[in-house]
Amino acid sequence: MRRRITFVQRPETPFSLDQAVLTPDALALHGIDGAREERATFSVDELPEELSDVLKQCHQLHVRWASERRYDAVAPFSSRVSPGLHVFYTPVDGSSEENKLKSLCALLKRAFDYGLKCKSPETLEESFITPPILSTRFASTAAFQYHSLLPTLDNLVAYIENKICSSSDEQCLRYAASIRSADSVDINYDSISHSLTVLGYWSQSPKNGWTDEIRRHAAGTDQVEVGLLGTEAATEPEDIKMGGLLAVVGKDDQLSMLSSGLPSEFGVAYGYGTDDSWAEPTLFSFPSRHQPLPEDATYSISFTSPTGLHPTMTISMPPSSLNSPPAPPDATCALHTYLTLPSTIFGDKYQLSTTDPLFLDSHNLVALHAVAGETDLEAPDWFVSRWGSNWLLELATPSESDQVPEEWNVTIPLHLRYLRPSESGYRSASVPWPVVFWACTAEDGTKMGVNPFDRVNLGWEGLFGTRTMFYQLHPSSDRLVEELEVPVLQLDDKGFFQSKAIELGTMIVIGLGSLWVLWKLGAIAWSSGTRPQRKSTKQKKSE
């Protein structure tokens, strides 16, 4: 197992060298204030058999989990996904789809939640959706996609502790337990590297900062890299500038300054000093697809009340969110939102894909660019086998001639499916917040290569070209899931009687209507049959 631990401090955060003390066996940290990313990489041989068997059926498997709590996505960890569990999967060729999905669904349920809406049907399409690929050049986009709300990662922690960590590996057990407090977790596997990578991200340090002793592995075979980094304003708009200190625990005898260049696990070269004096760390820059925005670039989500069966999602943004991002001068930018909707709620793709300017202007929409998943307008929720749908919408912004209001509202009309009856006459439907971002075309000639912190397979970034830069708006609420109260058929004594009466009344009306139609058809047939007879009788009398 290889570990990479990165601390990123804000430019104004103080730091002194006595907060990081490197010894031959460990790095002792004290009161580090900043975001933390921890990455563990396992070879397939290190994994339990039940996990490696499933991975061997995957060409690529990417899991993204984001907390329902609001958190800061600081550079270079600026990208976001909607709250919950996201799975992006491409199977290998050569084995049946039923076996692939059966083993994958079973693994997802054991590792995350046995209540996941992931069955083992005959085809992948009955549980996973197929995302649209608008940018064919973005080859890393997975073939199938899945989502489910998942408030906690308690099951994943237990799975790692019991299946991956040995009982004597205290560092592995401690890392697994720390996942409970993570703001986001990524899991990646591809058949080329044959390695599984688990990344956890914590946007805030504990009350007294990060205090930890990061020790080298007892066997001395597993590498542990630690970076203490900071960000500064970059010269080029597509770049992120960073600098700081590095150490390989158990190998280096002092913290190393960063120098320019991007080799190694961190993407930087090592530069050792010849004495104990410390100069300012050398800064380095690299192009990044995901860029930060100021803290006041926020958005909020709400639904009109009462929601009924046709709720309207409102995305509200202050004027600071409508300012064009600091993209290259020749870049073209547009504001977008990417909705991840569970099966209980959906949009009307025919309505949202309209080009009617009156409809679009009334909702401050520009266009629906992509939709995938369940869009059946009539099916109740219990008839829908797949998890839900995704929607990519371009949002309108005030023109330069318009006076910018204190709050710019974008409205998206949605629809709720019929849910199963309940005793109260209502059921709850949970809707995760969408992500809202600016998408800007990068300058011609910009090499958007993979940087050490790059994050791909988020679902929405694969719908754009490879030279697109993204600027994420920050959600403003403490909880990023909306709870809707959905009216359903009531199942208490009175409601049950009423439901039976309604069913009986409906059957009577249908029966009477059918008899009336048959009676009318019979009358028409009888009258059309008697007319020729009357004509022939009259003709005989005249003769």
Curated annotation (Swiss-Prot):
GO terms for cellular component: endoplasmic reticulum membrane; glycosylphosphatidylinositol-mannosyltransferase I complex. Its main location: endoplasmic reticulum. Residues 525-543 are cytoplasmic. The chain crosses the membrane at residues 504-524. Glycans are attached at N409. One of its GO terms (molecular function) is mannosyltransferase activity. Pathway: Glycolipid biosynthesis; glycosylphosphatidylinositol-anchor biosynthesis. It is found in: Endoplasmic reticulum membrane. Required for proper folding and/or the stability of a subset of proteins in the endoplasmic reticulum. Component of glycosylphosphatidylinositol-mannosyltransferase 1 which transfers the first of the 4 mannoses in the GPI-anchor precursors during GPI-anchor biosynthesis. Probably acts by stabilizing the mannosyltransferase gpi14. It comes from the Eukaryota. Belongs to the PIGX family. It holds the Pfam family PIG-X. Residues 1-503 are lumenal. SMART domains: PIG-X. The keyword Membrane applies. One of its GO terms (biological process) is GPI anchor biosynthetic process. It is a single-pass type III membrane protein. The keyword Metal-binding does not apply. Keywords: Endoplasmic reticulum, Glycoprotein, GPI-anchor biosynthesis, Membrane, Transmembrane, Transmembrane helix. InterPro entries: Pbn1 (IPR042322), PIG-X/PBN1 (IPR013233). The lineage of its organism: Eukaryota, Fungi, Dikarya, Ascomycota, Pezizomycotina. This is Protein pbn1.
